[in-house]
Amino acid sequence: TGLIAPDKKTVDYIKRSDGQVPKNWMEFCIDTPNSDATVFEFDASSLSPQIAAPHSPENSENAEEFSNTVFDIAYIGACTGAKYVDLAAAASVLKGRRIASTVSLKVAPASLQDEKKALNDGTLKILQDAGAEFLPNSCGICAGYGKDRLTEGQVCLSSTARNFQGRMGASSSRVYLASPYTLSLIHI
């Protein structure tokens, strides 16, 4: 298990988003790791774009390793991969461009708040102009629910956090994971 202690920046974000901050939040902070803690430090900016192959997030490789993979669906969605910052990252790639005609781009903003912000600043318009189909804010495809769930044999590149077999629909579907930015770059 990996745990990341909340810091002041995290709590400030929660306060700004009308979230409830537990009164005892400081108990979860660590000034110095205790003897049982293992701390890993790395520079994320040194990583090349990554894609995780089915059926585990652990199956991560450099994105270029998947250049011959054909995707049916590009999905920017879920609470983990469709926050405002994610939608804006995808829009920064797709502005003035269209998604490949062979791919269906589906977007389900993480929350109504994220959707409203993206609507107000034109981010959703950029995604729409690029060919996005918008879905409701919900677990939907991510949890394999509803009419948009993956069908037999479909291949999806998704900004969700999990790609276990059958997670997003049919057990024969294959889900690859990528950031919204990487997902957008691959499909233009």
Give each language-model segment a name.
Residues 117-180:
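Thiamine diphosphate
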Residues 183:
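Iron-sulfur (Fe-S) cluster-binding modules
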Residues 1-101, 107-136:
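Accessory "access/gating" subregions that flank catalytic or transport cores
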Residues 186-188:
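Conserved small/polar residues in nucleotide/adenosyl-binding loops
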